[in-house]
From Swiss-Prot:
Residues 1-10, 342-365 have a biased composition (Polar residues). Acetyl-CoA binds at L979, D980, S981, R998, T999, W1054. Residues 11-20 have a biased composition (Low complexity). It comes from Arabidopsis thaliana (Mouse-ear cress). A zinc finger (ZZ-type) spans 1175-1238, 1295-1347. This is Histone acetyltransferase HAC4.
């Protein structure tokens, strides 16, 4: 492609190739490079001398002030230092100009022997020149030189004489007046310069000259030659001359009336020096106004130590033919300066450094310096410039940005030698760019968009000599600023003072850490802070904290060679510089597409009506129209229809400018296979109307109390750029995870002190009372004594903020929860996220279509079992009947009355388990052949409803099914262990019977389950009506505030109402309670009262209580013993107690059984109604056996009397007085009724559904707590349900996020670093990039690590997963018992090798060990062999038992707490 192709004016030269640039340097440029470096060294030496003189003068003034007892405050002192810096820079420039004028040859100018003397001579004349400048400045302020008339361009030539012959030529100095006495430059280097039209540079009769540019406080009228030349109306001035004649103040001054096309200066990039140096982003040194001001292209810029001087984004390219330039807004260019290059320029302020500089120059000699200048402009972007640039232009560019190579170490060690004014603005600006979430062109900073790209690159860059623009320099400065604690470092001290001083005016810097385990709550703003916040200000962030990488989802940049936009190469006549274009489209191109006038203002200006800036544009416009509070609710201005990409044409152009070549292929939506797409957000399945409905719901805050909801709605009405673009709220914190004291089981309250320690895989907590009561400085945790000194003292005040996600298109930020973003699918650059606003735009412009619902598997995609099918069919049938009845009573048709829709019932887990009988209880009944274990099947049943197009989990219950293989007393029994729900069911009206529709649905699910169990052959169901304590959760984590926790009597009545319905449908035969059925002999019951008849369930109340009683009974002393629990005391059951109950033979276990039943009955009796026993089959009134076969003998006179065949035979052999009914003379006859339809053996038609986190409720609750899957609001319930379904469809995916070992922040998928030796040692990219990791082993990138789990596409779990799992468990058992060296069992040899690896592995956390541990846990969960030979099986089962004991202890403690509250309430009412 021809790079010299003519294009219209104001175009930008770009490169069409992504290959490395080829730069050809001419000998003339080599000579100029050598001259540049020597002149740079001389300037530094001049600056050092001037600075030394100024310090001596300042010492004199300080002594004078001390004698006069004058005190100078800090602000005045800082202003004085800044003023001195400006004076030194101005004096250095003047001295160099005088040296140029007085030198007659090249050798004389660079003669170091007489250099110091010449400088001191010139310094003696400095007083007069400064007086002239003060006079000129005073005249300017008085309005004497404020009017600049627009004149046409004139040709000004530079006449020089007195040539010298040294083999090199010096490029002429561009001045507005001819220089006299200067040494000659070759005639071939003389050139004519022309200035363009000067109109629009400064308006005629402008009131104040210093309003042209932000930050001009006092004009400094001086040319490059040092002469004092006042600005007159008939002298054409260029931008270079204007800024050379202008003195910049230290802090920017606000515009009084900023012109719309000249207010592009940025406070962070504002110069403090009165000239343009090599920081000019335009290679030719061209600096122009937004109109058409041009300047000579071969001027020698002043290479000031301040790298950010002269940064003017309103410049445009130079046009050599001087044609009139179009009056269009100028392109926005990226910041460029040597500060961000690999090499820094430093101005030494110590004269001891001058010999080193001189030695470097002398060693340089006449060596060639090829390619030096290209690094100073746009590294890697100049291509074939020998063919593109005229000779004069090349020579001018060669002098445009001289550089002095200084090692990076010197920058860190001697930060005072660099420009403090530059860093004073650059570091705060980097902090702003790191956290700014404003959309493109909406941030007050015009360069924010480019700076954000720099920050994103820096966050992940580890290349020592990175050539990415501004990367290395910024990294060095940030590392130094983070580590520097010296109060003598002027730069760092000034930056911190500047940030503290401007903390209310800097654009808000907000931390956004997702799923952070150690994040703190945002401090409350003061009244001043809140007032500044309303005006668009910000809170002051912690500098050290902000240096931490934010774990909002960062979209990491590819290497520089991969970010070349796909665009045509365009060149500009006259300039000819070929540059790699920005990923950001320049302002000129955008204006051409949109015809939109963009007005940028300095960031420190209070923009009027800032709250009316349309932040989310079209999307929020549509949402706000439907918001009850009015059209302006949410702080958005109702403007014309706009969006993140304002026009379809712009969208197309943006894609062409920013998309890499390999991504610039537009594919049709119709041909994309949804199953192969990486979908990160559920919003991609919505239609635009559904998206708007979702956002409206977010801002209603369903689930919160009325007070909190109104507060959040009010915050949404004052939405700022830092707020989430969906919910309109900025700072949201998760509910803290509840923690419990391991010794006593009591929940540790918020903000309470406690002690913590990690033991094995578990973390234990100890409350302050238990810690203080621990004897011998030891605490017993999990059967292990731990010294108290090892426990860490903590406060239960940890808060975790919600995470953020950034749109890849408009770069707006939203909460992960609001966006329904799946962070588990976030694989960095490969995962694309489109915000709802851009999504609506694309759908409405037909650029994409909503994905099919099958693209993201939901609840309906879960496996259908016979149980779930039975429950769904029954539920839908009952709902239809209820709806028909309601329509009949209301006189409407079936379709006219609302009903519950989109309901899905699924069995999410069905696992075989074994319940081991506790040791002491088993020992008590060993002689009676009591079973040592009870096999059962644990099932988890969940109800989902699609609410606002998201399937939300509303109801869940865990059940235990003991079949015919369990044996008595658990044979054919079902235990409803846990049940939970959240109050989001739709609709919310009541049924015909008066109950809520959600209650009706939940009751029907329970009745349907009992009906299913009865048909399978189960005889009874047991329910413990025990509500959780306030703040605790059973299944679903964090309930909404609008849902009250029911008291025990309310919950019991809820169950009994359900059972009454079931009785009417003949599902339930009889209801009683555990105490009346087993602890007392009522009526004609002839069964023994023994604990051996009690059904033994996992997690039930009485098994653990009985074990505690037996432990007390085994104690030998007669006195009292204090339990190590809260100072409570209980009496020991002694021999005297056994004699008191009539048990004379103390050695018999029956005596202990009888005494234990008595004590246990005393405990249960006050709450006996809570232990509900449901009979699904008829119960024999004599032996209390539930009859399943044969006949039941019924009495026609007595309604509820029936006995089994066995008891009937015994009844016939009794004497007449003992027959039914007892104590009555007239005896009743019994008639047989055949028992039918009860299966002889209980078999489950459904296959097992293994699940690591759904096999019991504690594992599921741990999953929700560890990932903050909360349900206290509908917005969080949607996201939590989405993630739960993700885990169900991806059983092999990691369940918990990886946490950084250093900062305790979440490490994203495929990000960060991992140690292959140390288990659990992971480091995020931010901590890794700080080079402060003291780890002895090599860290491996997690993106390339072999232990990264590959998630199945679209969450579709393999159908053979369960089958493979069963085969692996069988293989594990075989390999553990096999002793043959020639075993032919498939996989046996590999399994043995796997065992040997785990034994020899020193890491214990390698991928192989992790896989084996997962398999061992699955085996131990269901293992029934007490002498199992599988490695670690017994240990894993012991750990599981201890965890279950802790859970049981907490539940019993909660029951006792409720009993005490109930007793206290009864005392108060009585």
């Amino acid at each position: 492609m021809n790079n010299n192709k003519e294009v219209p004016q104001n175009s930008v030269a770009v490169s069409s190739s992504s290959s490395a640039p080829i730069t050809v340097i001419s000998p003339q440029q080599d000579a100029n490079n050598f001259i540049k470096k020597r002149r740079t060294a001389l300037r530094n030496r001049i600056y050092a001398i001037v600075r030394h003189k100024q310090k001596q003068h300042q010492i004199f003034l300080d002594k004078k002030n001390q004698q006069q007892q004058q005190r100078v405050d800090d602000a005045t002192q800082r202003a004085l230092l800044e003023k001195q810096d400006q004076q030194c820079i101005a004096a250095t420039r003047m001295i160099e100009e005088e040296l140029l004028k007085s030198s007659r040859s090249f050798e004389e100018y660079f003669d170091l022997r007489t250099f110091d003397a010449r400088v001191r001579t010139i310094l003696q004349q400095l007083g007069t020149m400064l007086s002239q400048r003060r006079a000129a400045a005073a005249a300017m302020n008085n309005g004497e030189a404020q009017c600049i008339t627009s004149t046409r361009a004139v040709h000004t030539s530079i006449s020089v004489s007195n040539s010298f012959q040294c083999g090199r030529s010096l490029v002429p100095i561009n001045c507005t007046t001819a220089t006299a006495g200067a040494f000659s430059i070759g005639p071939d280097m003389q050139t004519h310069h022309s200035t363009g039209a000067n109109h629009q540079m400064v308006e005629v009769n402008r009131p104040n000259m210093n309003q042209i540019t932000c930050g001009i406080s006092s004009p400094l009228i001086t040319g490059f030659n040092g002469n004092c030349v006042p600005v007159s109306a008939n002298i054409p001035m260029t931008s270079q001359d204007l800024f050379n004649a202008t003195h910049f103040s230290t802090l920017p001054q606000p515009f009084l009336q900023p012109p719309p096309d000249q207010s592009h200066m940025h406070r962070y990039s504002m110069s403090n020096v009165a000239s343009f140096g090599q920081s000019n982003p335009y290679p030719c040194g061209v600096v122009m106004s937004s109109g058409s001001m041009a300047v000579a292209q071969n001027s020698i810029p002043w290479n000031n130590p301040n790298p950010m001087q002269g940064l003017d984004p309103t410049v445009t390219s130079y046009h050599s033919n001087l044609q009139p330039m179009q009056q269009t807004p100028l392109p926005k260019r990226q910041l460029h300066h040597p500060l961000w290059n690999t090499n820094f320029q430093s101005a030494p302020n110590n004269r001891d450094n001058l010999p080193q500089v001189s030695q470097q120059l002398s060693n340089h000699g006449s060596r060639q310096h090829r390619g030096q200048h290209s690094q100073n402009l746009y590294p890697g972007q100049l291509q074939n410039q020998d063919r593109l640039l005229p000779n004069l232009t090349q020579q001018a560019m060669a002098l445009a940005a001289p550089v002095m190579h200084v090692p990076s170490k010197q920058v860190n060690e001697d930060c005072g030698q660099t420009s403090s004014n530059t860093v004073l603005r650059w570091i705060p600006f980097m902090f702003h760019a790191r956290h700014c979430k404003a959309k493109k062109d909406k941030c007050a900073s015009k360069f924010c968009f480019q700076a954000r790209k720099i920050v994103k690159h820096i966050d992940c860059c580890k290349v020592p000599n990175c050539k990415y623009r501004y990367c290395l320099g910024t990294r060095m400065w940030l590392d130094h600023f983070k580590q520097c604690k010296s109060i003598s470092c002027r730069t760092c001290v000034a930056v911190r003072e500047y940030m503290e001083k401007n903390k209310y005016t800097i654009v808000p810097l907000r931390r956004a850490k997702c799923s952070s385990a150690s994040s703190k709550c945002q401090p409350k703003k003061s009244s001043k802070s809140r007032q500044a916040y309303k005006k668009g200000g910000a809170e002051a962030p912690s500098v050290d904290a902000d240096l931490q990488r934010s774990i909002k989802r960062p979209k990491l940049h590819r290497p520089s060679q991969n970010i070349t936009p796909e665009t045509k190469s365009i060149s500009v006549t006259g300039c000819g510089v070929v540059c790699k274009p920005h990923s950001l489209m320049n302002m000129q191109e955008k204006d051409g597409l949109q015809s939109l006038k963009v007005e940028a203002m300095p960031m420190d200006i209070d923009v009027p009506g800032a709250s009316e800036i349309p932040v989310t544009r079209e999307l929020v416009k549509h949402v706000a129209e439907d918001t009850p509070k009015g059209n302006n609710c949410g702080g958005f201005a109702m403007v014309e229809k706009t969006s993140c990409l304002l026009a379809q044409g712009k969208s197309k152009c943006m894609n062409e400018m920013s998309a890499p070549k390999e991504e610039n292929v537009k594919q049709s939506v119709e041909v994309v296979d949804a199953s192969k797409m990486e979908i990160s957000s559920l919003v991609e399945l919505f239609t635009p109307e559904q998206v708007k409905e979702h956002i409206r719901s977010l801002r209603q805050w369903v689930g919160q109390s009325k007070t909190k909801a109104e507060k959040n709605k009010a915050m949404g009405c004052s939405m700022s750029v830092n707020s989430c673009q969906l919910c309109a709220v900025e700072w949201l914190v998760f509910e803290p995870v509840p923690i419990y004291c391991s010794p006593c089981g009591i929940r540790i309250k918020k903000n309470a002190l406690h002690y913590s320690i990690a033991v094995g895989e578990s973390r234990h907590y100890v409350c302050a009372p238990c810690y203080n009561e621990a004897r011998e400085k030891l605490v017993f945790l999990d059967g292990t004594s731990i010294p108290k000194t090892r426990l860490q003292k903590k406060k239960n005040d940890e808060q975790v903020p919600e995470g953020w996600v950034q749109c890849d298109k408009c770069e707006a930020w939203q909460h992960i929860i609001c966006a329904l973003f799946n962070s588990r699918r976030n694989h960095g650059e490969s995962t694309k996220y489109t915000c709802p606003s851009c999504y609506i735009q694309e759908v409405e412009q037909r650029e994409r279509r909503p994905l099919p619902l099958s693209a993201v598997p939901g609840a309906t995609s879960l496996p259908v079992t016979s149980l779930s099918k039975h429950l769904e069919e029954r539920l839908f049938k009952k709902l239809k009947e209820e709806r028909q009845e309601r329509a009949r009573l209301q006189g409407k048709t079936y379709e006219e009355v609302p009903g519950a829709e989109s309901l899905t019932v699924r069995v999410v887990a069905s696992v075989d388990k074994v319940l081991e009988v506790k040791e002491r209880f088993l020992e008590l009944f060993r002689e009676e052949n009591y079973p040592s274990e009870f096999p059962y099947k644990s099932k988890a049943i969940f109800l989902f409803q699609k609410i606002e197009n998201v399937e939300v989990c509303l109801f869940g219950m865990f059940v235990q099914e003991f079949g015919t293989d369990s044996g008595p007393p658990n044979e054919r029994r079902v235990y409803l262990s846990y049940l939970d729900s959240v109050k989001y069911f739709r609709p919310t009206f009541r049924t015909v019977s008066g109950e809520a529709l959600r209650t009706f649905v939940y009751h029907e699910i329970l009745i349907g389950y009992l009906d299913y169990c009865k048909k399978r052959g189960f005889t009874s169901c047991y329910i413990w009506a025990c509500p959780p304590l306030k703040g605790d959760d059973y299944i679903l984590y964090c309930h909404p505030e609008i849902q009250k926790t029911p008291k025990t009597d309310k919950l019991r009545e809820w169950y009994l109402a359900m059972l009454r319905k079931a009785s009417k449908e003949d599902v339930v035969v009889e209801c009683t309670n555990l105490y009346n059925h087993f602890f007392v002999q009522s009526g004609e019951c002839r069964a023994n009262v023994t604990a051996a008849r009690l059904p033994y369930f996992d997690g039930d109340y009485w098994p653990s209580a009985a074990e505690d009683l037996l432990r007390q009974m085994n104690q030998e002393d007669d006195g009292e013993t204090k339990l190590h629990r809260k100072g409570l005391t209980k009496k020991v059951i002694s021999k005297r107690a056994l004699k008191a109950v009539g048990q004379l033979d103390l050695s018999l276990n029956a005596s202990k059984d009888r005494l234990m039943m008595q004590k246990l009955g005393e405990t249960i009796c006050p709450m006996k109604e809570d232990f509900i026993m449901v009979h699904l089959q008829h119960c024999c009134k004599h032996c209390t056996t539930l009859m399943v076969s044969g006949n039941r003998w019924v009495c026609n006179h007595c309604k509820n009397f029936q006995i089994c065949d066995k008891c009937y035979e015994v009844e016939q052999n009794r004497i007449n007085i003992e027959r039914h009914p007892i104590n009555q003379k007239e005896k009743h006859a019994l008639f047989p009724v055949a028992i039918k339809d009860v299966p002889t053996k209980i078999e489950d038609k459904d296959n097992n559904l293994e699940s690591e986190f759904f096999h019991n409720r504690q594992a599921f609750l741990n999953l929700c707590q560890g990932n903050n899957y909360q349900y206290e609001t509908l917005r969080r319930a949607k996201h939590s349900s989405m993630m739960i379904l993700y885990h169900l469809h991806n059983p092999t995916a990691p369940a918990f996020a990886t946490v950084c070992t250093i900062c305790q922040q979440e490490v994203e998928n495929s990000q960060g670093w991992h140690c292959e030796v140390c288990p659990g040692y992971d480091v995020c990219s931010a901590c890794y990039s700080k080079d402060s990791i003291n780890h002895s082993h090599k860290l491996t990138s997690r993106s390339s690590s072999t232990d990264s789990t590959v998630v199945q596409q679209n969450g579709q779990a393999s159908q053979s997963y369960q089958v493979k799992l069963e085969k692996l468990k069988k293989l594990l058992v075989h390999a553990a018992t096999c002793r043959s060296t020639q075993c032919q069992y498939q996989g046996c040899r590999k399994s043995k090798m796997l065992f040997r690896h785990c034994i020899d592995c020193t890491t214990g956390d390698c991928p192989i060990c992790k896989g084996l541990w997962s398999l061992l846990k699955l085996h131990a969960r269901n293992c029934r062999d007490s002498k199992c030979t599988v490695p670690k099986c017994s240990g894993l089962r012991a750990i599981s038992r201890r965890k279950q004991q802790q859970a049981d202890k907490r539940r019993r403690a909660a029951v006792m707490e409720m009993m005490r509250e109930r007793a206290a309430e009864a005392t108060r009412t009585g």
